[in-house]
């Protein structure tokens, strides 16, 4: 029996992981990034007094982990949406209901993935922890994109990724600057522009990679066939995607090695966090336990994401909303609500560097990692997905990047800047709300060649 109990005890090792930390030869610590700090604002300290009275060590460890992972967040009640979504899907209660419950269930899962990657970073060190956070930081968007590609829903992929970038640049950042300015109305809020500048350079590069395939179709003369134009656009997009991934790798090296100090979230001694923001300096769960929970959470995210992809058209028909509006506006708002709330809370506390790190860092990660990776995955699957997001979508992205860059150019902030960003987001949301133009071939704009250049405008 000992050979059976010991592995499970290792996987279920409890929150007293700091004992292992003190006994190890290396100190378990990591640089705190904006994503780590943002997610910590939604955590709450667990009361383990009852759990410690359990006589069985293995059972006590399992209960401790359950309490830390499931009950250690202010979003605990939202976990109820997960079994409800599974039941609704099993008994066919209604596909729009499945879509709504799945969206709600993704919210606490995304926050817990951030928590678990931070816990693993205590053991792996700052570099590997940073890479893990970079990979899992937008796990929901990446999983939805891959599942949508597997179902040949190219437009859903493009819409959802575009919506995530717009949401971070305008909604999250705008809300943070607005409420941060209101809460600190008697003093000017300042932030470090160095990190923002790096992110904007990369976002502009990503925008260039979206513009060129779009402009290529307009630049082609009438002698060039539509199929040839689409082939050139697809080849350019795949080449650009490889370049974007190289740029993202360089960005990770810049962020995690050469210029790490620019991206580490700093804590002020004279402005310490209160009890509402729990910042642990030691791990509360063990490595293998955290890894097992991370794998489990990822599997559940994949399950709910599959529900979202399968039912999005039914929700669109039932609610009278276009798929573009649901994908660009609703998916990012609900799916990343936890991370967004954390950014706003830290802006309230006059910690704009953390809020900017969350919004700009997430937008950069999607633009230079998730988007090109989706193109490469589609290429592997034999699906013709390019970087041409069409004229309306690409214009919205360009204007969002330009407006945000101008807003942050002087390193200071007030509530008026946040209000302008929010209003810009409302205008873009209204645009996609009234846009009821159907897409060809069941939304898969990347699969069907256009008959003439004039159809580019209506695509």
Curated annotation (Swiss-Prot):
Induction: By Ca(2+), Mg(2+) and Na(+). This is Vacuolar cation/proton exchanger 3. GO terms for molecular function: calcium:proton antiporter activity. The keyword Phosphoprotein does not apply. Residues 137-172, 335-370 are annotated as: Cation selection. Pfam families: Na_Ca_ex (PF01699). It is found in: Vacuole membrane. It comes from Arabidopsis thaliana (Mouse-ear cress).
